[in-house]
């Protein structure tokens, strides 16, 4: 007898004694008469017995409000349980009452021996058209194999069923994936996963891989049979299909255990694909195109998490120092992953293309601001709702705090840019680059930060060098090493300017270069070993060229001796070797030194023929001279070696500008510089040319050697230098040479000679003298009108010359010539003629000067017309500007009550200007007398022999005086001429001398 007790709380409600074979235990009611309380409890037990028994066999259900309740078993269910218990008891009693049996054979794995198998006769079907046979579906049995070889090996339906059950148990326990391969279909993959319904079978569908088909799973009959056996291991739990959602795709449910709207299936199970219009869709059903597109598949999350899990495992760190364990809730980890995604890439849906496009098209600043704001909100959510993930909140705060780093001090950036923006040399360029990086703040890339450190390193080195070099005013630590990199001249790298041999094609530049060679170069006459060209005269001494080494000896010993050259007295680094500005060294304007601080001395420089050599401190570059010029050897005239600098600039001039460039150099630059100008004048001229032709600022300089002993800069041409021991100037380009033009530059070298006298050869006095000659020389005046028309303005320096110019008809001649060229020259001539008429009326010199000064400003406005490549134009502009400014200043001086001495000096100045003109005019007046006397003497030669001696001597004295006045000499000498007929007149004069 077995006793069952039913308890409610702490009270015993019912005690039942059951026999082992009884399906339901009988209720025992005591027969004795109980007391009053016992009777009440007995009645309650009798009343609740059946209800509690049904409740014991009930199931737990959760309603829509989340309340868990016990659903009691139905009466039908209770009767079934009683019948099942009775059957089990009867089966056990029958087994125990059965007689003893002998075991005669043992069969392993439940198979049937071949001897016991019966041969099955296969009856072929008759192919007739008849009614469709009714399909009979069996529940869970596998059809016997028809293959004879399988039957011979003992494969029976029961053995295959056992195999499937064993594999199902293994997959359910380990989670491995199974593949079922049918006769006609592809492999069907399935595995057992743990869900809220228990361990459920999940089939791999096509849409799990992103493939959308009308039939999501294709299986044949044999595959379905095997899958049915495997599905027996699925949890047999009542399920409501209406609660299925994402992640339920591929799950298998038995039809008799589920409730809710679903699609009908041929089998007794359904494979979840998705939901269409509230109806659960089976994966094996063939859908229409529209139904397939409207079906809401339940595998999106599964695909996402499968990719997330795979990528997470592939990229996890391999050098972990501990064994990982599952300490956090998986659901909470999913929430954290979503928050991190929203902080990095804010969006409405992670699969939304519009959100992705919006983030992509947003500018950097706006996106960072939006992203930072979202990160702050998410960080607060993590701290409040997920305290276990404080590390994530810390990461977000640190990461986005760097994103928000901005440089608020924009004013400092502007001030730095104002200070160093105009400098193009180190360290100002490094300061400017560092300033550009610092203003970026958090937007600076790692490469830019590394570049900032490099710029800061260069600034640090500069400050250290400056401190060391300027300390105590000593040059002991001065270093100015030569650049290790050769200068890249882009004009020599363009393929269009080079021939097939890599030589420069001069083009029109070579033709216009003749203006240099014809005016400032001498043609070398070969012969005598070029001895007459070896010594080069300089203002304070000589320098020897290596032109004699063009004749090369084949004796190696003698050749080595020639390569030694002739050394001058070597000078150490002194104050003259450096140039400073604002207490800083201008390194391009200093002499080159070695690593130990000693100067770099020049060595023997080999000569070449017909080359232009450029490249100062680096490796020299040899350019062939233009083809028309290279047929002969040219050498710069004495005092004009600086022409090689302008010739080097011509390399970087466009061919269309070559004519204008060479004319400017010939008509403006060289006349101002003359012979042996100072370096500061040459640098200023280069600056003027680079303003018109910016590309020339990058032109390379010829080699320049510094002679501190003679205070001279030697511009080395292609004939090299035999003398050695000179210092080397570091400046390598025209831009670097222009730095010598600064008045604030503290340098002795800028006053060294490179060519000319200190005063210009073309000045106002020389011009007025030429105008005085041209007044009485029509050919010279015509040449001035054609070539230098603005020279006529210089006649305003002298009222007398201005009147003579107007009376000679030169202004009318100019008007007829200029009327075809432009209005400015014609207006200039009319104004000069008007001023001359007004001046001729005045008697006093100072009144005439006042009339000229009053017209200076108006004439300046008339002729000022941009830049004209003409030396007389600049000279006229300069003179008129001086007159206008002098007029304005004198007026202010007179208003304040002061007196100028200009009135007293005007007559003296006019007298000095007219003195050579007066002598010349006297000689011109006497010219006709000389001509007439010569003719008279020739005609009356015979008649003078009859004259008295006293009259003949008087005639000789008159002729001698006329000749002296005409030639401008006090001791005039009349050369004998067989054509003059004056031998008898010239003879006494020659005897006198």
Swiss-Prot record:
Keyword ATP-binding attributed: no
Record-annotated active site: 207 (for p1 proteinase activity), 216 (for p1 proteinase activity), 249 (for p1 proteinase activity), 641 (for helper component proteinase activity), 714 (for helper component proteinase activity)
Pfam family, one: Peptidase_C6
GO cellular component, one term: host cell plasmodesma
Protein modification: Potyviral RNA is expressed as two polyproteins which undergo post-translational proteolytic processing. Genome polyprotein is processed by NIa-pro, P1 and HC-pro proteinases resulting in the production of at least ten individual proteins. P3N-PIPO is cleaved by P1 and HC-pro proteinases resulting in the production of three individual proteins. The P1 proteinase and the HC-pro cleave only their respective C-termini autocatalytically.
Entry's Gene Ontology molecular function annotations: cysteine-type endopeptidase activity; serine-type peptidase activity
Domain (Peptidase C6) ranges: 633-755
Peptidase S30 domain segment(s): 154-298
Record keyword Lipid biosynthesis present: no
EC number, UniProt record: 3.4.21.-, 3.4.22.45
Residue numbers covered by motif Involved in interaction with stylet and aphid transmission: 349-352
Annotated site residues (Cleavage) in this chain: 298-299, 755-756
Keywords for this protein: Host cell junction, Host-virus interaction, Hydrolase, Inhibition of host innate immune response by virus, Protease, Serine protease, Suppressor of RNA silencing, Transport, Viral immunoevasion, Viral movement protein
GO biological process assignments: proteolysis; symbiont-mediated suppression of host innate immune response; transport of virus in host, cell to cell; viral translational frameshifting
Motif extent (Involved in virions binding and aphid transmission): 607-609
Family per record: Belongs to the potyviridae P3N-PIPO polyprotein family.
Record text about domains: The N-terminus of helper component proteinase is involved in interaction with stylets. The central part is involved in interaction with virions and the C-terminus is involved in cell-to cell movement of the virus.
Protein name: P3N-PIPO polyprotein
Organism listed in the record: Potato virus A
Phylogenetic classification of the source organism: Viruses, Riboviria, Orthornavirae, Pisuviricota, Stelpaviricetes
């Amino acid at each position: 007898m077995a006793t069952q007790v039913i308890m409610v709380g702490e009270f015993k409600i019912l005690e039942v004694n059951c026999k082992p074979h009884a399906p339901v235990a009988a209720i025992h009611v005591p027969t004795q008469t109980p007391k009053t309380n016992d009777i009440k409890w007995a009645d309650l037990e009798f009343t609740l017995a059946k209800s509690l028994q049904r409740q014991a066999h009930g199931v737990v259900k959760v309603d829509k409000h989340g309340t868990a309740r016990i659903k009691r078993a139905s009466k039908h269910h209770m009767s079934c349980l009683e019948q099942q218990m009775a059957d089990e008891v009867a089966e056990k009693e029958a087994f125990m009452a059965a007689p003893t049996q002998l075991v005669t054979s043992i069969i392993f794995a439940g198979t049937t021996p071949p001897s016991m198998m019966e041969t099955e006769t296969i009856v072929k079907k008759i192919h007739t058209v008849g009614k469709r046979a009714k399909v009979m579906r069996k529940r869970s049995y596998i059809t016997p194999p028809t293959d004879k070889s399988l039957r011979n090996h003992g494969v029976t339906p029961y053995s295959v069923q056992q195999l499937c059950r064993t594999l199902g148990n293994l997959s359910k326990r380990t989670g491995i994936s199974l593949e079922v391969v049918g006769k006609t279909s592809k492999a069907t993959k399935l595995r057992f996963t743990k869900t809220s319904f228990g361990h459920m079978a999940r089939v791999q569908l096509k849409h799990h891989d992103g493939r959308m088909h009308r039939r999501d799973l294709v299986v044949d009959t044999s595959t379905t049979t095997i899958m049915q056996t495997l599905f027996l291991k699925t949890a047999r739990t009542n399920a409501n299909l209406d609660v299925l959602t994402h992640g339920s795709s591929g799950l298998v449910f038995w039809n008799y255990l589920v409730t809710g709207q679903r699609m009908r299936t041929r089998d007794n199970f359904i494979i979840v694909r998705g939901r269409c219009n509230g109806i659960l869709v089976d994966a094996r059903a063939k859908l229409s195109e529209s139904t397939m597109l409207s079906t809401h598949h339940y595998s999106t999350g599964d695909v996402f998490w499968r990719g997330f899990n795979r990528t997470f495992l592939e990229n996890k760190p391999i050098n972990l120092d501990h064994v990982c364990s599952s300490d956090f809730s998986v659901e909470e980890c999913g929430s954290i992953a979503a928050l991190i995604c929203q902080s990095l890439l804010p969006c409405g849906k992670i699969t939304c293309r519009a959100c992705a496009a919006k983030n992509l098209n947003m500018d950097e600043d706006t996106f960072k601001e939006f992203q930072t704001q979202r990160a702050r909100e998410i960080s607060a959510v993590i701290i409040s709702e997920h305290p276990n993930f404080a590390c994530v909140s810390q990461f977000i705060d640190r990461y986005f705090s760097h994103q928000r780093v901005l440089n608020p001090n924009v004013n400092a950036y502007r001030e730095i840019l104002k200070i160093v923006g105009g400098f193009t040399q180190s360290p100002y360029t490094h300061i400017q680059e560092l300033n550009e990086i610092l203003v970026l703040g958090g937007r600076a890339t790692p490469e830019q930060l590394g570049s900032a450190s490099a710029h800061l390193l260069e600034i640090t080195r500069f400050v250290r060098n400056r401190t060391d070099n300027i300390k105590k005013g000593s040059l002991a630590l001065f270093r100015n090493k030569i650049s290790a990199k050769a200068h890249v001249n882009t004009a020599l790298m363009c393929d269009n300017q080079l021939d097939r041999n890599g030589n420069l094609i001069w083009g029109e530049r070579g033709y216009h270069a003749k203006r240099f060679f014809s005016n400032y170069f001498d043609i070398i006459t070969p012969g005598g070993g070029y001895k007459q060209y070896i010594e080069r005269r300089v203002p304070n001494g000589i320098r020897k060229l290596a032109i004699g080494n063009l004749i090369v000896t084949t004796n190696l010993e003698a050749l080595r001796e020639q390569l030694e050259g002739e050394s001058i007295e070597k000078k150490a680094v002194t104050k003259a070797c450096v140039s400073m500005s604002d207490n800083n060294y201008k390194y391009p304007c200093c002499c080159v030194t070695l690593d130990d601080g000693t100067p770099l001395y020049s060595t023997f420089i080999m000569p070449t023929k017909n080359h232009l050599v450029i490249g100062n401190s680096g490796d020299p570059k040899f350019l062939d001279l233009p083809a028309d010029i290279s047929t002969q050897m040219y050498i710069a005239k004495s005092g004009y070696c600086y022409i090689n600098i302008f010739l080097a600039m011509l390399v970087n001039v466009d061919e269309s500008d070559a004519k204008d460039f060479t004319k400017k150099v010939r008509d403006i630059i060289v006349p101002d510089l003359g012979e042996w100008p100072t370096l500061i004048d040459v640098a200023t001229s280069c600056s003027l040319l680079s303003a018109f032709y910016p590309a020339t600022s990058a032109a390379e300089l010829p080699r320049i050697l510094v002679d501190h002993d003679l205070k001279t800069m030697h511009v080395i041409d292609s004939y090299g230098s035999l003398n050695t021991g000179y210092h080397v100037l570091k400046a390598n380009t025209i831009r670097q040479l222009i730095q010598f033009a600064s008045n604030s530059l503290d340098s002795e070298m800028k006053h060294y000679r490179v060519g000319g006298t200190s005063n210009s050869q073309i000045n106002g006095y020389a011009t007025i003298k030429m105008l005085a000659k041209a007044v009485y020389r029509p050919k010279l005046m015509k040449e001035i009108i054609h070539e230098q028309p603005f020279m006529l303005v210089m006649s305003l320096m002298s009222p007398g010359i201005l009147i003579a110019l107007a009376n000679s008809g030169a202004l009318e001649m100019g008007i007829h010539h200029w009327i075809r060229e432009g209005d400015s020259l014609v207006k200039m001539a009319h104004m000069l003629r008007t001023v001359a008429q007004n001046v001729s009326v005045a008697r006093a010199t100072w009144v005439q000067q006042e009339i000229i000064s009053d017209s200076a400003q108006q004439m300046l406005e008339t002729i000022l017309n941009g830049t004209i490549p003409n030396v007389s134009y600049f000279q006229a502009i300069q003179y008129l500007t001086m007159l206008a400014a002098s007029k304005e200043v004198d007026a202010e001086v007179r208003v304040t009550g002061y007196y100028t001495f200009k009135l007293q000096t005007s007559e003296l100045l006019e007298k000095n200007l007219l003195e050579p003109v007066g002598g010349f005019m006297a000689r011109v007046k006497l010219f006709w007398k000389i001509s007439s006397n010569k003719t008279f003497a020739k005609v009356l030669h015979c008649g003078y022999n009859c004259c008295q001696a006293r009259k003949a001597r008087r005639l000789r004295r008159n002729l001698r005086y006329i000749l002296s006045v005409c030639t401008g000499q006090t001791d005039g000498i009349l050369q004998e001429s067989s054509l003059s007929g004056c031998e008898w007149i010239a003879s006494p004069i020659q005897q006198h001398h």
